């Protein structure tokens, strides 16, 4: 059985495993480019941990559980095009939006101070 955790970050829930990278909504607590590369990241909103055959569920979060990681870079998602048109009225509006993302890699999943898997 593989070890993984389900976390809440950036308004969404992610199933994360150590050694893999993930994109979440941009972490801009203190400005756009405040978080640099290799900034350590501790995520405490862990909803569930699966380790070997044991499952630990939180209510709403697992006590004394953290996911350790580091930020790789800040990037932007693909452009989302919004096109509004009123038929027969010559009214058209085209706008685009690119969501800011933060890419981070998970280094370890910890429970009660012990690292479950590096």
Swiss-Prot record:
It comes from Zygnema circumcarinatum (Green alga). Keywords: Chloroplast, Plastid, Ribonucleoprotein, Ribosomal protein, RNA-binding, rRNA-binding. It is found in: Plastid, Chloroplast. Belongs to the bacterial ribosomal protein bL21 family. GO terms for molecular function: rRNA binding; structural constituent of ribosome. This is Large ribosomal subunit protein bL21c. Part of the 50S ribosomal subunit. The keyword Transmembrane helix does not apply. GO terms for biological process: translation. This protein binds to 23S rRNA.
